[in-house]
Structures are given as C-alpha cells and as structure tokens.
Swiss-Prot record:
Any one GO molecular-function label of the UniProt entry: rRNA binding
Name this polypeptide is given: Large ribosomal subunit protein uL5
Alphabetized Pfam families for the sequence: Ribosomal_L5, Ribosomal_L5_C
Keyword Ubl conjugation attached: no
Homology family: Belongs to the universal ribosomal protein uL5 family.
Assembly behavior: Part of the 50S ribosomal subunit; part of the 5S rRNA/L5/L18/L25 subcomplex. Contacts the 5S rRNA and the P site tRNA. Forms a bridge to the 30S subunit in the 70S ribosome.
Length: 190
C-alpha cells in the first residue's frame, strides 16, 4: 500500500501578515484588551455595471468572463428591477454582475490587487482616503480591467470599469483606515 498525503493549501500571505503583524500593531494603536476587538476584513465585493447591455445582451457575457478571470469565482448577474423607457431598459434585463469574495479567495484577491494591479495603473498617485461610508467600509473604482494580469489586453472587446467595496468588521472609519493602511492600501497623502 502506498501512503498518500494530502497537503493543505497554503495560507494566503496577506492573511499571514494580518495575523502575525497587523493584529498586534492595531492592538497597540487602539489599546484593545482583546484580540477579537481588532478590525478585520469581512468580505470584498467586486461589481461591474454594464449599462450598454440594455442594447446588446452579449456585452454581459464579456463582463462575466472578465470577473471570473479576475476573481476566480463565477459572478452573480444583476437584473433591472424596473423598466425605464429613456434607457431602453426592460424589467428583468441583465445590466451588471458582481462577486462577493470571502475567506482565502478574498485575501488572495486583495494581495493581487495591492501588489500587481494597482501599480500597473498609469500615473498612479494613490487611492483616495476619503471614500469611507461612515460605517467602516471602503469603496473605490477602477476604470479598466486590463490592469489585472489574468486579463489578456489583446482579447478585450470593451473597456469595463469596476467598483470594489471592502467591508470591515469595525463601524469606525478611523479604525478601518488604519487597518487598510497596514494591509498596504496606497492612500494619497493629503
């Protein structure tokens, strides 16, 4: 008989950094008595609105394909709730897609975003540090999908932007800012 051992998948390096370095730093900074009080990233939502899909239904397929390549997870398609004649939109028509990332996939996506994608943006000076929603969540947008290595620039049919929401466990923007700064988010210095 042969012994077969199954190796556990490697822990994402950003998660290791969070557990080993960031938690102790935030405990000192905010004087927490319990490590469970430290802010943590709960989920990341990546969404792509495809308004032009109202006229051409094939555009949504490209958005789904791009989001699948970028996040490693199949997106959920969002549909119009109401018909709007001015936008040539019918109720139930596909108009966008989104992915909710949790766990290791979330950590891997954040790592790729911070180390590979954001530095590839032309004339990048940092992201705005004032886009918190008052509840400890951070929202920002990217203008094109080609900055991710998973997307082949030659195969892009349309340039699509995306919105990224980082949901944290804290309800305070100051704590969320400190968490994201420690994780490596390149905020602009104002």
């Amino acid at each position: 008989m042969t012994d077969t051992t199954v190796e556990a998948p490697a822990t994402p390096r950003l998660k290791v950094k969070y557990n080993e370095q960031i938690i102790p730093e935030l405990e000192k900074e905010f004087k927490y008595s319990n490590p469970m009080q430290v802010a943590r990233v709960q989920k990341v939502v990546v969404s792509m609105g495809v308004g032009a899909a109202a006229r051409d239904s094939k555009l949504i397929e490209g958005a789904v394909k791009d989001l699948t390549l970028i996040t490693g997870q199949k997106p959920k398609i969002t549909k119009a709730k109401k018909s709007v004649a001015q936008f040539h939109l019918r109720e139930g028509q596909a108009i966008g897609a989104y992915v909710t990332l949790r766990g290791d996939r979330m950590w891997e996506f954040l790592d790729r975003l911070l180390t590979l994608a954001l530095p590839r943006i032309r004339d990048f000076r940092g992201i705005n540090g004032h886009q918190f929603d008052g509840q400890g969540n951070y929202n920002f947008g990217l203008t094109e999908q080609s900055m991710f290595h998973e997307i082949d620039p030659d195969s892009i049919d349309h340039v699509r932007g995306m919105d990224i929401t980082v949901v944290t466990s804290t309800k305070d923007d100051k704590e969320a800012y400190a968490l994201l700064k420690h994780l490596g988010f390149p905020f602009k210095e104002n």
